[in-house]
UniProtKB/Swiss-Prot annotation:
InterPro entries reported in the protein's UniProt record: Ribosomal_bL33, Ribosomal_bL33_CS, Ribosomal_bL33_sf, Ribosomal_zn-bd
Organism: Pseudarthrobacter chlorophenolicus (strain ATCC 700700 / DSM 12829 / CIP 107037 / JCM 12360 / KCTC 9906 / NCIMB 13794 / A6) (Arthrobacter chlorophenolicus)
GO MF, any single term: structural constituent of ribosome
A GO-annotated cellular component: cytosolic large ribosomal subunit
Biological process annotations from GO: translation
The protein's name: Large ribosomal subunit protein bL33
NCBIfam families documented for this protein: PRK00595.1, rpmG_bact
Coiled-coil stretches: none
Length: 55
C-alpha cells in the first residue's frame, strides 16, 4: 500500500514550449524537495527544451 507522503512519488514533467508533451518519472523527495526542472527532448518541436514538474 502506498503511503500518503511517499518518498518517491510519481510526477509529470510538462514541456515549457507549450506543446502539451509530458514525461512521467519518479523523484526522491528527500534529495529534491523543490520542483524539478529538466532539459529533455520534445518530439513535437524536435528540440531539447525545459520540462517542469507539474502537480
Amino acid at each position: 500500500m502506498a503511503k500518503d507522503k511517499d518518498v518517491r512519488p510519481i510526477i509529470k514533467l510538462k514541456s515549457t514550449a507549450g506543446t502539451g508533451y509530458t514525461y512521467v518519472t519518479r523523484k526522491n523527495r528527500r534529495n529534491d524537495p523543490d520542483r524539478m526542472v529538466l532539459k529533455k527532448y520534445d518530439p513535437k518541436i524536435r528540440q531539447h527544451v525545459e520540462f517542469r514538474e507539474e502537480r
